[in-house]
């Protein structure tokens, strides 16, 4: 395979992204470990669920919980997330909460420093969207509203620095600008140095 991120496949006029990896494994050993866990979960046939009478299968709720959060964190740290990410999480919890092994999920979140982000997402779901979180879903009301509200505020800002359509030097300038704009996310939410890999 000669691509890192994904290739494209044309299937009956529909463009499909074919990802070699679920996560950016170049981001360090934790991402590689989580990638292996996601592969284990997706290959765990006893938890795959058939979609109707088709030969298509949905991955387990454990896979989806970890992947949804990892995907949202990646966009949050390096770009920005929109309300859609919170709604994806809220609807996932509403439908799948009983199928998730929350103890294992929380252990992974602690290991890869996603716990604070998840607590913020849960806080937004509960306190801003009015969702009643199931007892099995971890929350941390002692954290307060500051950080979840800062994340929510960031979602609605129009100053997101997107690099689509830029090439060469302009791409690099915007990439560096976006990186410095998002330093607070590494320090306050991810609790890692932005230069950590």
Positions of predicted regions on the chain:
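Conserved NTP-donor binding/palm subdomain of two-metal-ion nucleotidyltransferases/polymerases, i.e.
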Residues: 1-197
């Amino acid at each position: 395979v000669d691509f890192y991120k994904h290739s494209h496949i044309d299937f009956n006029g529909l463009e499909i992204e074919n990802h070699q990896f679920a996560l950016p494994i170049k981001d360090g050993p934790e991402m590689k470990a989580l990638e292996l866990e996601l592969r284990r979960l997706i290959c765990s046939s006893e938890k795959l669920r058939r979609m109707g009478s088709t030969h298509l299968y949905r991955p387990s709720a454990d896979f989806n919980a970890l992947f949804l959060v990892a995907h949202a964190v990646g966009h949050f740290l390096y770009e920005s997330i929109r309300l859609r990410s919170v709604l994806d999480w809220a609807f996932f919890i509403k439908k799948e909460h009983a199928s998730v092994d929350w103890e294992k999920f929380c252990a992974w979140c602690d290991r890869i420093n996603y716990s604070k982000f998840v607590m913020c997402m849960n806080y937004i779901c509960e306190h801003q969207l009015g969702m009643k979180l199931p007892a099995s879903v971890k929350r941390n009301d002692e954290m307060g509203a500051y950080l979840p509200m800062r994340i929510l505020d960031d979602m609605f800002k129009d100053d997101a620095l997107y690099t689509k359509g830029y090439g060469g030097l302009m791409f690099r300038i915007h990439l560096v600008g976006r990186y410095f704009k998002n330093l607070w996310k590494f320090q306050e939410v991810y609790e890692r140095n932005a230069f950590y890999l």
